[in-house]
């Protein structure tokens, strides 16, 4: 797991979800799991666990992408200690974190991915990134809910 300062935010991989003790020791209260190809994590009952089964490539339902991005952004806005995981922690996790940060900071997803890459290495799938950016741009174009 890698902490992304200055946020209460960690990026991890599927193996990190097996290490419940390290998650609890870090003070993490919520997990966003993005890997369709991994089994669901077995976490303590009092931990918030949100699973959004995303493919590391193209073909994801926009509503699932939107839900993953908004959920991550809401946890960030509320300053909830959050772990975002995907299989290897290199593609889906960094992309969804960048999209969520773009909502929170009002910066572009590209700028936010550059910010994430200062803390962790990534290898975001181009097809997946294009889908994420498309959903992000549609979010920025929507008027705020009344």
What spans do the regions from the language model cover?
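Cysteine-based protein phosphatase catalytic domain of the PTP/DSP
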Residues: 2-81, 102-134
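A phosphate-binding catalytic loop at a beta-strand-loop-alpha-helix junction
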Residues: 75, 79-98
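C-terminal domain-closing interface element
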Residues: 139-146
């Amino acid at each position: 797991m890698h902490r992304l300062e200055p946020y209460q935010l960690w990026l991890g991989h599927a193996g990190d979800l097996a290490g419940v003790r390290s998650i609890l020791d870090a003070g993490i209260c919520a997990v966003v799991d993005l890997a369709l190809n991994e089994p669901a994590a077995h976490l303590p009952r009092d931990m918030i666990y949100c699973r959004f089964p995303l493919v590391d490539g193209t073909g994801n339902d926009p509503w699932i992408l939107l839900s993953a991005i908004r959920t991550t952004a809401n946890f960030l806005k509320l300053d909830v200690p959050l772990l975002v995981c995907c299989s290897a922690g290199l593609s889906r996790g960094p992309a969804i974190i960048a999209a969520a940060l773009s909502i929170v900071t009002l910066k572009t997803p590209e700028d936010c991915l550059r910010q994430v890459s200062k803390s962790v290495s990534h290898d975001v799938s181009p097809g997946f990134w294009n889908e994420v950016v498309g959903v992000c741009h549609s979010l920025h174009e929507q008027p705020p809910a009344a």
